[in-house]
From Swiss-Prot:
Record field: catalytic activity: K(+)(in) + H(+)(out) = K(+)(out) + H(+)(in)
Protein name, as recorded: Potassium/proton antiporter CemA
Family membership noted in the UniProt record: Belongs to the CemA family.
Gene Ontology biological process terms, A to Z: potassium ion transport
InterPro entries in the cross-refs: CemA
Designated gene of the protein: cemA
Function, in words: Contributes to K(+)/H(+) antiport activity by supporting proton efflux to control proton extrusion and homeostasis in chloroplasts in a light-dependent manner to modulate photosynthesis. Prevents excessive induction of non-photochemical quenching (NPQ) under continuous-light conditions. Indirectly promotes efficient inorganic carbon uptake into chloroplasts.
Membrane topology: Multi-pass membrane protein
Native organism: Morus indica (Mulberry)
GO molecular function, one term: antiporter activity
């Protein structure tokens, strides 16, 4: 009975790990959501919601087009046929840029919708499988309890160095950048640098409070070993 329960719990754990990937892959091959987003974006009332980076990009592009038009007016010695070709080129470039902007916005909405749907399905799945989650939690607690204090201290030290250590900002930048990309958002250095400079500090404060309140009470020897290894 225990083996069967453990096997079911392992299947549940594998489902939690691979379910978001499977949902994302399903929407990639099934074009229904993409068609709905395309239809909604192209038929909705025209409303532009832009962040500062997008506004700067759009402004820069239109300034370039305006400069090109002014340059066009300065070329009075050109023949009318050549000037007409230049106007057509500016028009085609504008249309192409608008299409690229629309595709980018559709891509953002599609990725964001896919991730929200994955989160909702995963949450419902976790609630319905509460018994397996409790069993996995008990197995994890038993596994951690059986570890020696030295192994526990080493694991805590390794985890803290990875999350809030000297080289951790590079890892946070990569992780936040990949989350941004996964949700379809444009790369934003200001937000990423803001999160990287504040979030590890918050984690460090929470971790120190956890050592002070919990580990000192449960396992003082573990705290002594941890501080010895850390020094």
């Amino acid at each position: 009975m225990a083996k069967k329960k453990a096997f079911i719990s392992l299947l549940y754990l594998a489902s939690i790990v691979f379910l978001p990937w499977w949902i994302s892959l399903s929407f990639t091959f099934n074009k229904s959501l993409e068609s709905w987003v395309n239809n909604w974006w192209n038929t909705r009332p025209s409303e532009i919601l832009l962040n500062d980076i997008q506004e700067k990009s759009i402004l820069k592009k239109f300034i370039e087009l305006e400069e090109l038009s002014l340059f066009d007016e300065m070329l009075k010695e050109y023949s009318e046929r050549r000037l007409q070709k230049l106007h057509v080129g500016v028009y085609n470039e504008t249309i192409q840029w608008i299409k690229m902007h629309n595709e980018g916005r559709i891509h953002t909405i599609l990725h964001f919708s896919t991730n929200i749907i994955s989160f909702v399905i995963l949450s419902v799945f976790s609630i319905l499988s509460n018994e397996e989650l409790i069993f996995l939690n008990s197995c994890l607690q038993e596994f951690l309890y059986n570890l020696s204090d030295t192994i526990k201290a080493f694991s805590i030290l390794l985890l803290t160095d990875l999350c809030i250590g000297f080289h951790s900002p590079h890892g946070w930048e990569l992780m936040i950048g990949s989350i941004y990309k996964d949700f379809g958002f444009a790369h934003n250095d200001q937000i990423i640098s803001g999160v990287v400079s504040t979030f590890p500090v918050i984690l460090d404060t929470i971790f120190k409070y956890w050592i002070f309140r919990y580990l000192n009470r449960v396992s003082p020897s573990l705290v002594v070993i941890y501080h010895s290894m850390n020094d």
